[in-house]
């Protein structure tokens, strides 16, 4: 949802939009809670409070102040990610298709012939990093840019088997126009760009697990972050390959040679980072015009020094000349060298050309060895061709996509490789590598060993759920790592499946109860965004590809109502009960009935079950931004840091009742996942709360009324306001609590409406209006370690007779309390209190 804050109402009516006017009788937190549970996507928030907007944004719900109709129209028609700390909005708006254009934020693409393969009459527009060049389109009170581009489709095309670019793009654009927006993927770059600078300020040692090409620009500014990926393809790994011939397959209709060069250099940079944790000078021989240098410099400041007879316009220092062996001495330490020398074929026949290429390959390799043989802190990436070669077994083979699969591949070498054992690799084996293997990731660092690290902050986004990881190792890492941000796939199945298929692999599934943590926030993507200064207009949907975001060691842990809080907890319930259910009271009715409380009069006002916990369980797929376990735990140890005003603290028994209702709901829905989740949450409540039951009580609290509107034959009709199991020396503590609650007890709005047979031989009158006070008293007794209440639900009633009588219904009557007392069962009154 998105909240657009206005000072005045607007005449225009918008679809899927609701107006909320700030309620001055409620505090900012309650207003935020009410807004978050509205069911439309767009909320026009009138007479707004900036504090309420802050609360919503911290909760991950985008809430923006609007100063003009132009701002309103722009934000209401599309989704966006909001950097609420810096007041920057990143639109995810593809309406530019109506201008017959596709967009890119990679400059090199604009220098290709891609426009020849677009839809008829369409053009390509460069919009800068994350759409920064579009800022000039919006003259708004906040900074605004459109981060939507088609780079994801262009890159997907490059790695796909498709060759016809126009048909590929047409299909993908149609898919984009007919399916739900993958909002998390679109905003992920914004998130990463906010996350890692934030972590870098706090933590000296950061580990990042499983980065992909989408992150290749983000980490250029963080050479000290230790990356873990799937490891490199080594020369020695070719032993598994069978020999093949030249394939000559075209990969892309438009020229992607620059993309290949960019990927080679960035791969080399990250390999260098892994060895030396600092930025290198980048030397490049050949590969002009290297327009992609512009893209790299948009993200991070590097020195590029290049040699090529052709112009290289974005190089820091360009030598418009050939590079020779003698020039190697000019190259300094703390550098990488990219050798991409290849003479043009011109009119040479293939035999003559093949001889030239092989000679050049040997020459290139010699340059690489010469560069690495002296000095320190060096890495080299060199162009090679498929031919009979002796290569170091530890050298890394690269084959990033290029326009055609021919004879070309690249070799990545460090200073240790050149002194390592060499192996003869036949030409046919290298052709097999070229024909069958694509380097899909610029990150070729070794795999992560799933174990805790005492002095490092571990980030593992979408990296550890794969079933080739041991599930218990992942759980143990999350349980024991002191500082981390780790995601795992949430169990969205209805049959409690332990793993689910994703693309061509399987992922383990998890619930929050799989983890035994007491210093972690477990939330959703949008809940995590709020913690790092971002919010989003489109919440996570239960697609089956959703992840739990688990933060260990965050300073936000105790701020219970600010981050990963209960905002939106009832939104799914509202959507269902106001549109599909038998009555809008269905949730209240079901919760009472499933706990054998059959007095439904005023059930929506006085419910015996925690609606928070119930909704958090049965609709966890929709509202798991709320960290239920943390909420339970912090209340159990009385360390919840509550900033808001009015805040209702549940008694632990209310939470148990909610679990019982959720379990019955799950059985009716045949939802085995909710059934397990509710059982495990109930066990967790019993674990963190020391709940004892007065199932064999020796004292009770009685409430006597001035007048009872029914006939009775018991001696003193009274409301048993809870039973206790206490020793006599605890009586002063019990009476103190009763006295402390005197005002609230006598101010209870106690009513009765009918009589009924509670059991065979027990005729009673119903009582309403006392439950909230009962649960408050329960909490006070619990905190004083006094056993109060039974394991079965408290059903307030007045016993009228121990014989069978017919039910009597009357107009609701308010009962006036005469006295409240503490009496020993089958004994004397030990305390009596009148108003």
Swiss-Prot record:
The keyword Nucleus is annotated on this UniProt entry: no
Gene Ontology terms: cellular component: viral nucleocapsid
Biological-process GO terms, alphabetical: symbiont-mediated suppression of host innate immune response; viral process
Domain of life: Viruses
Compartment(s): Virion
Chain intervals for the UniProt region annotation (2'-5'-phosphodiesterase activity): 693-835
Active site: 718, 720, 797, 799
InterPro entries linked to this entry: VP3_Rotav
Pfam families per the UniProt record, alphabetical: Rotavirus_VP3
Catalyzed reaction equations: a 5'-end diphospho-ribonucleoside in mRNA + GTP + H(+) = a 5'-end (5'-triphosphoguanosine)-ribonucleoside in mRNA + diphosphate; a 5'-end (5'-triphosphoguanosine)-ribonucleoside in mRNA + S-adenosyl-L-methionine = a 5'-end (N(7)-methyl 5'-triphosphoguanosine)-ribonucleoside in mRNA + S-adenosyl-L-homocysteine; 5'-triphosphoadenylyl-(2'->5')-adenylyl-(2'->5')-adenosine + 2 H2O = 2 AMP + ATP + 2 H(+)
The EC number(s) this enzyme carries: 3.1.4.-, 2.7.7.50, 2.1.1.56
A Gene Ontology molecular function term of the record: GTP binding
Region 2'-O-methyltransferase activity, residue ranges: 246-428
UniProt keyword annotations, A-Z: GTP-binding, Host-virus interaction, Hydrolase, Inhibition of host innate immune response by virus, Methyltransferase, mRNA capping, mRNA processing, Multifunctional enzyme, Nucleotide-binding, Nucleotidyltransferase, RNA-binding, S-adenosyl-L-methionine, Transferase, Viral immunoevasion, Virion
Chain residue ranges for the region called N7-methyltransferase activity: 171-245, 429-555
GTase/RTPase activity: annotated span: 556-692
Subunit structure: Interacts with VP1. Interacts with VP2.
Comment, domains: Contains a bipartite N7-methyltransferase domain, a 2'-O-methyltransferase domain and a GTase/RTPase domain. The C-terminus contains a phosphodiesterase domain that degrades the 5'-triphosphorylated, 2'-5' linked adenylate oligomers produced by the host cell in response to IFN stimulation.
Family indicated by similarity: Belongs to the rotavirus VP3 family.
Function: Multifunctional enzyme involved in mRNA capping. Catalyzes the formation of the 5' cap structure on the viral plus-strand transcripts. Specifically binds to GTP and displays guanylyltransferase and methyltransferase activities. Has affinity for ssRNA but not for dsRNA. Capping activity is non-specific and caps RNAs that initiate with either a G or an A residue. Together with VP1 polymerase, forms a VP1-VP3 complex positioned near the channels situated at each of the five-fold vertices of the core.
Name the record gives this protein: Protein VP3
Organism from which the protein derives: Rotavirus A (isolate RVA/Monkey/United States/TUCH/2003/G3P[24]) (RV-A)
């Amino acid at each position: 949802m998105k909240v657009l804050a206005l000072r005045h109402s607007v005449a225009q009516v918008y679809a899927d939009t609701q107006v909320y006017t700030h309620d001055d009788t409620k505090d900012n937190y309650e207003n935020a809670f009410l807004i978050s549970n509205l069911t439309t996507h767009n909320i026009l928030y009138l007479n707004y409070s900036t504090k309420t907007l802050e609360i919503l944004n911290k909760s991950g719900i985008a809430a923006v102040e609007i100063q003009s109709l132009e701002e309103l129209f722009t934000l209401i028609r599309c989704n966006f990610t909001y950097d609420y700390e810096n007041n920057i909005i990143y639109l995810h708006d593809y309406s530019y298709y109506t201008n017959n254009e596709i967009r890119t934020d990679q400059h090199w693409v604009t220098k290709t012939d891609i426009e020849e393969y677009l839809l008829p009459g369409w053009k390509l527009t460069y919009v800068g990093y994350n759409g920064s060049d579009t800022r000039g389109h919006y003259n708004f009170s906040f900074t605004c840019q459109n981060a939507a581009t088609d780079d994801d489709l262009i890159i997907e095309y490059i790695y796909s088997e498709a060759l016809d670019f126009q048909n590929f793009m047409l299909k993908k654009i149609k898919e984009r126009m007919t399916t739900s927006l993958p909002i998390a993927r679109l905003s992920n770059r914004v998130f990463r760009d906010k996350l890692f600078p934030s972590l870098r300020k706090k933590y000296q040692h950061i580990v990042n697990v499983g980065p992909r090409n989408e992150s290749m620009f983000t980490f250029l500014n963080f050479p000290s972050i230790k990356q873990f990926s799937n490891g490199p393809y080594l020369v020695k790994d070719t032993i598994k390959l069978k020999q093949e011939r030249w394939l000559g397959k075209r990969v892309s209709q438009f020229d992607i040679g620059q993309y290949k060069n960019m990927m080679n250099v960035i791969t080399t940079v990250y390999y260098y980072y892994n060895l030396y944790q600092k930025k290198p000078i980048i030397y490049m021989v050949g590969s002009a015009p290297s327009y992609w240098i512009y893209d790299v410099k948009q993200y991070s400041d590097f020195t590029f020094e290049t040699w090529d007879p052709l112009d290289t316009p974005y190089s820091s220092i360009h030598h418009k000349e050939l590079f020779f062996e003698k020039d190697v001495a000019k190259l300094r330490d703390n550098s990488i060298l990219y050798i991409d020398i290849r003479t043009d074929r011109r009119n040479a026949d293939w035999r003559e050309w093949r001889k030239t290429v092989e000679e050049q390959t040997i020459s290139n390799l010699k340059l690489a060895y010469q560069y690495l043989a002296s000095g320190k802190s060096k890495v080299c990436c060199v162009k090679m061709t498929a031919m009979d070669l002796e290569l170091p077994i530890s050298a890394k083979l690269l084959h990033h996509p290029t326009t055609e699969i021919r004879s070309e591949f690249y070799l990545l070498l460090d200073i240790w490789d050149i002194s390592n054992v060499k192996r003869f690799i036949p030409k046919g084996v290298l052709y097999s590598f070229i024909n069958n293997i694509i380097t899909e990731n610029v990150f070729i660092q070794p795999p992560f060993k799933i174990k805790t690290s005492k002095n490092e902050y571990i980030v593992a986004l979408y990296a550890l759920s794969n079933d080739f990881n041991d599930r218990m190792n992942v759980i143990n890492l999350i349980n024991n790592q002191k500082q981390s941000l780790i995601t795992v796939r949430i169990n969205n199945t209805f049959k409690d499946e332990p793993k689910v298929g994703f693309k061509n692999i399987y992922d383990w599934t998890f619930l929050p109860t799989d983890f035994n943590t007491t210093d972690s926030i477990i939330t959703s993507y949008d809940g995590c965004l709020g913690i790092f200064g971002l919010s989003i207009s489109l919440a996570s949907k239960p697609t089956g590809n959703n992840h739990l975001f688990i933060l260990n060691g965050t300073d936000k842990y105790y701020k219970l109502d600010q981050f990963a809080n209960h905002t939106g907890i009832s939104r799914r319930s509202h959507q269902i009960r106001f549109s599909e259910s038998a009555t809008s009271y269905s949730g209240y009715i079901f919760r009472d009935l499933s706990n054998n409380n059959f007095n439904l009069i005023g059930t929506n006002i006085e419910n015996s079950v925690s609606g928070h916990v119930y909704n958090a369980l049965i609709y966890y797929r929709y509202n798991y931004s709320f960290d239920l376990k943390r909420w339970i735990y912090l209340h159990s140890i009385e360390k919840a840091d509550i900033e808001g005003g009015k805040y209702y603290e549940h008694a632990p028994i209310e939470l148990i009742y909610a679990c019982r209702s959720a379990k019955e709901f799950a059985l009716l829905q045949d939802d085995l996942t909710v059934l397990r989740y509710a059982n495990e949450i109930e066990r967790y409540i019993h674990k963190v709360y020391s709940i004892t039951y007065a199932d064999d009580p020796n004292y009770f609290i009685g409430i006597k009324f001035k007048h009872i509107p029914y006939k009775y034959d018991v001696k003193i009709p009274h409301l048993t306001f809870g039973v206790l199991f206490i020793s006599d020396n605890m009586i002063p503590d019990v009476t103190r609590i009763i006295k402390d609650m005197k005002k609230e007890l006598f101010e209870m709005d106690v009513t009765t409406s009918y009589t009924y047979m509670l059991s065979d031989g027990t005729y009673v009158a119903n009582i309403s209006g006392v439950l909230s006070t009962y649960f408050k008293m329960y909490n006070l007794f619990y905190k004083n370690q006094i056993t109060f209440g039974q394991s079965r639900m408290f059903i307030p009633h007045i016993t009228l007779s121990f014989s069978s009588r017919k039910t009597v219904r009357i107009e609701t009557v308010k009962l006036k309390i005469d006295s409240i007392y503490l009496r020993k069962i089958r004994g004397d009154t030990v305390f009596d209190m009148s108003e």
